[in-house]
Amino acid sequence: MEAAVTIGLVAIIGLALFDLWVGVANDAVNFLNSAIGSRAASRRAIMAIAAGGIAFGALTSSGLMEVARKGVFDPDRFTDPETGAVVVLSILAVYLGVMAADVLLLDLFNTFGLPTSTTVSIISELVGASIAVALWTTPGGLGQALTVIQTGPVLGIYTGIFLSVLVAFTSAALIMFLVRLFFTHDVPRTFPRIGWIWTGLSFAALIYFVLFKGLTNTRLLPPEVAEFISANPAKVVALAFLPAGLVGLLMRHEHEKVLKLIILLGTGSLGLAFAGNDLVNFIGPSVAAAQAVLVEGIRLSGSVPTPTWALLLAGVVMVASLWRSKKARRVTDTEVRLAAHGATEQRFRENGLARALVNWARAVLKVVKAITPGWLEDRVNRRTEPPPPTADQPPYDLLRATVNLSVAALLISIGTANKLPLSTTYITFMAAMGAALGDRVWRWQDAEKRLAGILMVLGGWLITGFLAASGAFVMASLIVLGGSWGVFLAVGAVAVGLIRMKLVNGSDDEEGPPPGSGRPPMDRRTPRRWANSRRSTPTRAGV
């Protein structure tokens, strides 16, 4: 028993470091795609700003993890009813099963360059692992084991997260269309007149996002300031809008500098919020397991304080992953290409569903054109029609990058303020896709491939929950039934899976085409093995 506990604790801490590495590699798409896609700065500068945001967010994190993960499972089911003491082996099985499954799942998505939600994955893994432990350690069979899950909150979390996908896509498409309608593609001409308004709105959205999502739950802001921000969002937005709008007015003839500043601020802001709030998704299970073993009388229904040294170590690992992982580039490349301007080389092939949706869109567009006055259609086309692409054009322009960041930040802030469950990955990805549609960068020639790629990512999100819950169920079952040997089997399965994915996709340290470079990506199915046999003439992104 003691040997199994010791081995399990060591394994879960080691897996936490791997989980940080693969988690950042996948979530990097949240705060890198806009800056990289618009080439707002050099790659080193963008990475440095994102790394600074991550490091600052890690150091100022509150370090609290809700052990029961917002009511996913009933923690009292894993305590001794007579003494109230934690059943250590059961808790270790739950959290080790979660960590083992999470590492494999995130690395699988990273290998094929697909973004997924770490929030959905960890919630689903907690569901699967807790059911497995309850099944094998309590009487009553599967029916009784299922009662360990609090189905109402779990279904609410899933529903809220997937509804945010639709909201992010439609709102970003509408806002981008309106922004382009006002600014046109001749931004140097229109920005001096109305650019200060968009500057103020963008800065206000990002500042509010930093304050509310990034800092209100940290140690940096005094409680009274955090309370004021939560209670007075309109005042906070107004206080941010006025000076930002003034800066935009004073710099109205330097639109590139203003837009780049917004993009880089948004990049650092998303990095800060990610580390400050989502960091504990990766190290929380390890901290909770260590507390259950080492701290007498710990209550699973409470919050677990994370030591400062653990936060610092986690921040270092996250920054290292951001700089070193080529899989992070692969995931970012997927989103940048799907949202890029012009006939960009895509990773995905057409399929029947994408073709049917495109044909349906053609029919709807014909109806819209039939009821739209000709003069209005001509005027809208003159203001929103994209110009012919150039050879050195970035995947998307600076204005669209600011829309991506501002819409994502605003939606995340609103959801957080209203305590709505959401996924930053889903919102940032769908905001970028919606903005691309609203900016009219899709063409009928490549619409099916773009839509097939979006459907592939959406399909991956749908199966994330199933894969995460199933994987955690299997891992936790191995640990509960096998004891020390079960721990070895679970860790061995993770090692074999990681090695296998590295062999399939090539070394993680192998340099691939950077996002926006224009070089064609490797085939998404077996990216390295068939790459040489499928090479085509390089096409610059955005052409």
Spans of features found by a protein language model:
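Alpha-helical transmembrane segments and immediately membrane-proximal extracytoplasmic
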Residues: 2-420, 425-543
